[in-house]
Amino acid sequence: MASYLDFEKGIKQIDDDIANAKIRGDEHAVEILRKNLEKEITKTYKNLNEFQRLNLARHPDRPYALDYIRALLKDGYEIHGDRAFRDDPSIVCYIGYIGGKRVIVIAEQKGRGTKYKIMRNFGMPHPEGYRKALRIARLAEKFEIPIIFLIDTPGAYPGVGAEERGQSEAIARNLFEFSELKTRTIAVVIGEGGSGGALAIGVADRLAMMKNSVFSVISPEGCAAILWNDPSKNEAATKAMKITADDLKELQLIDDVIDEPVMGAHRDKEGAIKALGEYILKQLDELEKKDINDVVKNRIEKILSVGAYA
């Protein structure tokens, strides 16, 4: 059963009308309603505001990392563990082939349904998750395998145990190591890009965002609570924070925006998967034409240019 957001009420009403017309066997009404549905979809999604895009980024039906991995990766094999503490299910690592190219995918996985959300810790990695990512990234470097990072997290887990095991050090270590990693890297925000939890696997030669994803230093609710002592002002915070793909592209903080199907990735998963796959292959082709030393040099220069203004 489809889930509808508040701004999709008009779409829901027409969907319900179509379902009722089908029950009555009124094919003429169904045809008319489908045309009306197309118009309503175009009107609704033509000019989404920042808060509506935030809701789309968090939509429960939106494809998660494993949806993309299982669809795009051929002969995929999961690699587990940080070899120091434990295997963190919030970070998943796979080796396989995309379009005939061998790659390693390192991704944040939220989990679908109560059981798996708890197992994946709602996509909030512990330090051992980031250390697993670093271990696998070093493996990719050793065998000269490109890395695809898929970012989708509310943020790094802020629990006492995570802090005791060095959460901030694990994130900082990844930022340092990934900036000089001698292999080609592509990072894509597929849903939520929450603060350091996203940055920890977000240092790459290409940083892109799906059209309806977000990337921010803090959640809008957290921002509103700090600035106005009122988390309910999250809509105003969302607008002020410039967290959408288009905003960040304009600010030159990301390289590319990957277009989604008209109604978003949650309504057309196959279309979103196809768009991501095509983007990855295109960027890999471009990066493979360059010497790896030049690739790393360009990556470092890009990182150092962030926040620098003439």
Curated annotation (Swiss-Prot):
**EC code:** 2.1.3.15
Query: What InterPro entries does UniProt report for this protein, alphabetically?
Result: Acetyl_CoA_COase_a_su, ClpP/crotonase-like_dom_sf, COA_CT_C
The region annotated as signal peptide is none
Q: Which family does it belong to?
A: Belongs to the AccA family.
Protein name, per record = Acetyl-coenzyme A carboxylase carboxyl transferase subunit alpha
Instruction: Report the locations given in the UniProt record.
Output: Cytoplasm
UniProt keywords (A-Z) are: ATP-binding, Cytoplasm, Fatty acid biosynthesis, Fatty acid metabolism, Lipid biosynthesis, Lipid metabolism, Nucleotide-binding, Transferase
Q: Which domain of life is it from?
A: Bacteria
Q: Which residues does the UniProt record annotate as the domain CoA carboxyltransferase C-terminal?
A: 36-286
Assembly, per entry: Acetyl-CoA carboxylase is a heterohexamer composed of biotin carboxyl carrier protein (AccB), biotin carboxylase (AccC) and two subunits each of ACCase subunit alpha (AccA) and ACCase subunit beta (AccD).
Q: Which reaction does it catalyse?
A: N(6)-carboxybiotinyl-L-lysyl-[protein] + acetyl-CoA = N(6)-biotinyl-L-lysyl-[protein] + malonyl-CoA
**Matching HAMAP family, A to Z?**
AcetylCoA_CT_alpha
> MF terms per GO, please?
acetyl-CoA carboxylase activity; ATP binding; carboxyl- or carbamoyltransferase activity
Kindly list the GO CC terms recorded for this protein. acetyl-CoA carboxylase complex
Nucleotide-binding recorded as keyword? yes
Which pathway or pathways does this protein act in? Answer: Lipid metabolism; malonyl-CoA biosynthesis; malonyl-CoA from acetyl-CoA: step 1/1
Q: Which parts of the chain are coiled coil? A: none
Provide the function of this protein: Component of the acetyl coenzyme A carboxylase (ACC) complex. First, biotin carboxylase catalyzes the carboxylation of biotin on its carrier protein (BCCP) and then the CO(2) group is transferred by the carboxyltransferase to acetyl-CoA to form malonyl-CoA.
Which Gene Ontology biological process is one annotated for this entry? fatty acid biosynthetic process
Q: Which principal EC class is assigned to this enzyme? A: transferase
